[in-house]
Amino acid sequence: MSTVSLSLDEIFDLAKKTLLANGCDDETASILSDLIRNAERDGSLSHGLFRLPAYVSGLKSGKINGKGKQELKKISASVIKVQGNNCLAPVVLNKGLPELAKAAKENGVAVLAINNSHHMAAMWPETEKLAEEGLVAFACTSYKPAAVSYTHLTLPTKRIV
């Protein structure tokens, strides 16, 4: 097997062309390609190009909406909700993070709730964006347990219910 080296721009272009060819609109493809490129740049190979086949599979199956429009609703001064319309979470977060940051700065604390989206990407880009705005952030998801295995992971001998 041979190794192919790609520049960060080539990674972005490859990801974007692939996503566009498989049902994403330009905005969605750009957001996801940026995420893929940055994960590769940061050395997180499990969240870079490695994720592209899963994105394509979800798009082809119709599970992931590559052209969906998110709906943002301000529930209260500190609670923002974004209806994801089956888009991938990074696309939904792109819509909600600016309003979340604004609410947190105005009120001292804020929560962003996302419904009907799919998450299979890195979670630190969102917290990094908020940290760059001088905020503290926590990111959580309800994705499958043990989504990323660790080298010395041991499983419990008893099931905890």
Which residues does each PLM region occupy?
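Short, well-structured alpha-helical segments
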Residues: 26-37
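Active-site cofactor/substrate anionic-group-binding motifs, chiefly glycine-
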Residues: 51-96
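Short coil/turn connectors at secondary-structure junctions
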Residues: 76-79, 106-109, 132-136
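Generic N-terminal amphipathic, Lys/Arg-enriched alpha-helix
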Residues: 1-22
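N-terminal and secondary-structure boundary signal
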Residues: 20-23, 42-46
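Glycine-rich anion/phosphate-binding loop at the beta-strand->alpha-helix junction
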Residues: 111-153
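Alpha/propeptide regions of enzymes that mature by internal proteolysis
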Residues: 37, 90-115
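Single conserved hydrophobic/aromatic residue that forms the stacking wall/gate
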Residues: 152-161
